[in-house]
Amino acid sequence: IGIGTRIRKSPYYDSNLKYGVTGFTVYNKMYLPTGFSGPEKEYQSLINDVTFGDFAAERQIEINGPDALDFVRFIQPRNLDKCDIGSCKYIILTDMNGGIINDACLLRLDENKFWISPGDGDVILWLQGIAINSGMDITIHEPDVSPLQISGPKSGKLIQKLFDGKHDELGYYKAEQTSLDGIPMVIARTGWSGELSYELYLQDRKLGNDLFEKVYKAAQDFNGRVIAPNTIRTIEGGLLSYGSDFGREHNPYTIGFDRLVDVDQEIDFIGKEALKK
């Protein structure tokens, strides 16, 4: 793929080149690595040791304001009664007909602050369009956040080494504010690999290559490898990809996402009436 100025480079771009990236695709208008040492070697490291890579193309959407929770409940059909601060939830965004706009990981970082980590698409424009006429007191923007994903059975050991055990008790689909040698980030026990995973949501893109290098050096103690998103393992894990496996022509029920819909909750949401039928 040609490299140009119209597509955004991630904060880890130079590190990708340094460690042998073999190609890129475009995802959320950013360059996303497609390979390093080959799919088989990367797969074996993913299921046996520990891997990490550039997932900055998961461009975050931040929702702030007194009505942030109400807005998040309005744009998707999952019941968020138990979404406390520090919780992460897998969600789908639906249109007025119940069609799926995209899927995403939702992080609640504060009482009135959420991040939405979507699949490929223009989700931020959809949300900003809804917000204009919602009457809700919120702001929506893209923050300076760039995820780096760590995955594999030894990923917990790598996190323990990097953070001196500080996040050993971090629960599944939980997130915490943290830092690594002065590099600010949110750490979440989330991922898109089918293996034990963590995501480091870097909060200063100028420090991307510094973070990549620190993770690389620590990972060598666990036979770590730099990888790209591994399609083989996501298929095995039953993980669906928006745009490839499903799209707006599908509703949650047709692809087995019933658990992400609660039409009996009192809260109104986009597509509720359509999904009741």
Predicted regions and their residues:
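Short secondary-structure transition/capping motifs
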Residues: 59-64, 95, 105, 115-119
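Conserved, structured C-terminal
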Residues: 1-34, 106-277
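Acidic active-site catalytic centers that drive phospho-/nucleotidyl reactions
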Residues: 54, 103, 199
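Internal amphipathic helical hairpin motif
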Residues: 66-100, 155-183
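Acidic, proline/glycine-enriched N-terminal capping motif
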Residues: 1-91, 99
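Short amphipathic beta-strand starts and helix->beta connectors
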Residues: 39-48, 93-103, 132-135, 179-187
